[in-house]
UniProtKB/Swiss-Prot annotation:
One of its GO terms (biological process) is regulation of actin filament polymerization. GO terms for cellular component: membrane. Keywords: Lipoprotein, Membrane. It is found in: Membrane. May negatively regulate RAC1 signaling and RAC1-driven cytoskeletal remodeling. May regulate chemotaxis, cell migration and epithelial polarization by controlling the polarity, plasticity, duration and extent of protrusions. Belongs to the CYRI family. InterPro entries: CYRI, CYRIA/CYRIB_Rac1-bd. This is CYFIP-related Rac1 interactor A. GO terms for molecular function: small GTPase binding. It comes from the Eukaryota. It comes from Gallus gallus (Chicken). It is a lipid-anchor.
Length: 323
């Protein structure tokens, strides 16, 4: 255990200092049941990302159909192009529901008494790593989705076509797979700029409200501790030298940003207030020290998907750092 998570004896600025081995942490017997459950979800995450990355959309076919409304052949071509894409979008949406359940199981394990968040991380490094992997996936998914306007265009065309056919009393086969209720929920999901992050944020808020006997600090301290762990690993050369690849560096940055955003949505006053347990200036500084093209998406996530950045109580210095 000691070689997986090393707690340093020094405490600087009262923030926890750890090295959490994101590359090699393995589950203990006590973690295995939850770890297996989360692992079954995470094993599909790479194929989801590959699928989203390959998503080209049916923009040309839709334009042709709209410009030539009386050409039945072009209407059919557009419809036949869009339907398989909508099935793919449904698969992404359904994965978000699985991720939501997975996160709630993890939060249950990582926040339950009598242990503190620090003790949980010491005892359950493999679960902490899975939590990190969920955040990593989430930010990668949302980065890809934000860069792909075809998703909403395709889905809007699909919904318009379904509505038009319903008026004409036509039932299309795809409605057996994506019925009206499912389409409504998918519509709300894809309307979000960062749908997966919104899912995690809602899941965390729901977890806090459902577990009324659990102090909210148990959840927010779990998030702030994880953010501190990542920041320290990124800014300490002896830790960074332990990463075996650049991808682990990116992983660590994405996880840090992900937990900051979650903290900001769940904590009553957010991540940017003076009483926040996250060193926001330090976290932003660490990001800004990286090559700009690798962190622009992460800085944008802090700018546009946090809840409290523009509160009056947020220091001008922090706001200026994110200009």
């Amino acid at each position: 255990m000691g070689n997986l998570l090393k707690v340093l004896t020094r405490e600087i600025e009262n923030y926890p200092h750890f090295f959490l081995d994101f590359e090699n942490a393995q589950p203990t017997d006590g973690e295995r049941e939850v770890w297996n459950q989360i692992s079954a979800v995470l094993q599909d995450s790479e194929s989801m990302l590959a699928d989203l990355q390959a998503y080209k959309g049916a923009g040309q076919e839709i334009r042709d159909a709209i410009q030539n409304p009386n050409d039945i052949q072009l209407q059919e071509k557009a419809w036949n192009s869009v339907c398989p894409l909508v099935v793919r979008l449904k698969r992404f949406y359904e994965f978000s529901l699985r991720l939501e359940k997975a996160l709630q199981s993890l939060l249950e394990s990582l926040t339950c008494p009598p242990y503190t968040p620090t003790q949980h991380l010491e005892r359950e490094q493999a679960l902490a790593k899975e939590f990190a992997e969920i955040l990593h996936f989430t930010l990668r998914f949302d980065e890809l989705k934000m860069r792909n306007p075809a998703i909403q265009n395709d889905f809007s065309y699909y919904r318009r076509t379904i509505s038009r056919n319903r008026i004409n009393n036509m039932h299309l086969d795809i409605e057996n797979e994506v019925n009206n209720e499912m389409a409504n929920r998918m519509s709300l999901f894809y309307a979000e700029a960062t749908p997966m992050l919104k899912t995690l944020s809602n899941a965390t808020t729901h977890f806090v409200s459902e577990n009324k006997t659990l102090p909210i600090e148990n959840t927010t301290d779990c998030l702030s501790t994880m953010a501190s762990v990542c920041k320290v690993m990124l800014e300490t050369p002896e830790y960074r030298s332990r990463f075996t690849s650049e991808e682990t560096l990116m992983f660590c940055m994405r996880v840090m940003v992900g937990v900051i955003i979650l903290y900001d949505h769940v904590h009553p006053v957010g991540a940017f207030s003076k009483t926040s347990k996250i060193d926001m200036k330090g976290c932003i500084k660490v990001l800004k020290e990286q090559p700009p093209d690798t962190v622009e998406g992460l800085l944008n996530a802090l700018r546009f998907t946090t809840k409290h950045l523009n509160d009056e109580s947020t220091s001008k210095q922090i706001r200026a750092m994110l200009q």
